[in-house]
Amino acid sequence: MITNKVKTLILVNLGGPRTPSEIEVFLRDLFSDPFVFDLPLPEFLRLRLARFIAKKRAPKVQKSYESMGFGGGSPLVEETAKQAHALELALNERSSEQWNVKVAMACGYPNMRDIEFGKPNQDTVYLPLYPQFSRSTVLSTLAILETKFGECPVGSGGYVPHFGLDPNFHSISAKFIYEFFTNQLPKDQYLHYPEEKPNCDWRNLDLVFSAHGVPMRLIHKGDRYMEEVELSVKGIADELSKFGFNGGVHISYQSKVGPAKWTEPSTIQMISSLAKQGKHIAVYPISFVSDHIETLEEIGEQFKDLTWEMGGKSFVRIPALGIYPSFIQFLAEKVMHSDRKIQHCICREKGGESLQHCRFKD
């Protein structure tokens, strides 16, 4: 029975321009973030450089968005909204309280800095859709909320921590991959659903877990992102073996920007190497749970073309989890237990530093 009490879940994602007119704003927000664009410059110079880069990159990025067929924008906000709707249904089925689920973005719109998104507490819960901790995603989100409300939300009862190391996430991801290869997923629920499957037994192909790359300077500051990706992949691969998978398992990093050293190997390097060996290749977006430009265009088009150019025998893009029912139920369970307060600083443990208003700072 649902009571009159209403609780709010705010589903947070990185963001993406909904229309071409929002591209430069999105890029400006992205490159203005000190946890993303963290060059050792005075603040006024860093922000000026961020605006310059956003303006310079906008035309090139616009071409990529136009190629996806979503009106020149990104489908990420809409895909996140689908997940929000599914989560709202799941929470209201499971809970005696009424849940209202909103979508907020760290970059672009709807902007999580807006007044409609309230202070984290047991009645207003924030769930960032980042499986693995990184300074550039989770710590950035926490810093935005800290700036807005004057305290870090970790330990407030209104924050759901990253979930990529949870064994249940591993088993759900493995079953999703298995159901994809055995044609059990509803095609109409996934954007640009890959119709072509590898012309080999899926259990023997080379499976590349592609994560979004980060600059190595973040790793050197204490970011344990690479470790988290590796543990996520190991957990999923172990679960996949229960479905008979015996192929190659590889980890790589995509979406590098600029000349600085980033996490390696790059997915371009990995696919080139495997394709030259004549391998059957599948790519799974380990750090993404919502399809967008990096999964649809970068993985689905650029990496596919690279595979053929380098002599690969077949290529397939595995979709992101999206509204996969088991995943939505998994998230709902996390949300319902968010009032079990965290009793330590995950920012320092996973990202190398505490925020200024951390309630667990020594």
Curated annotation (Swiss-Prot):
What's a BP term from Gene Ontology annotated to this protein? heme biosynthetic process
**Role, per record:** Catalyzes the ferrous insertion into protoporphyrin IX.
Q: What organism is this sequence from?
A: Leptospira biflexa
Task: Please report a single Pfam family linked to this protein.
Answer: Ferrochelatase
What pathway is it annotated to? Porphyrin-containing compound metabolism; protoheme biosynthesis; protoheme from protoporphyrin-IX: step 1/1
Catalytic reactions on record: heme b + 2 H(+) = protoporphyrin IX + Fe(2+)
A single Gene Ontology MF term assigned here is:
ferrochelatase activity
Subcellular location(s): the record lists: Cytoplasm
Can you say what this protein is called? Ferrochelatase
A cellular component annotation (GO) from this entry? cytoplasm
Q: Which gene encodes it?
A: hemH
The family assignment reads:
Belongs to the ferrochelatase family.
Keyword set for this entry?
Answer: Cytoplasm, Heme biosynthesis, Iron, Lyase, Metal-binding, Porphyrin biosynthesis
The record's annotation in NCBIfam families points to: hemH (TIGR00109)
Q: Which PROSITE patterns match?
A: FERROCHELATASE (PS00534)
Enzyme class comes to lyase
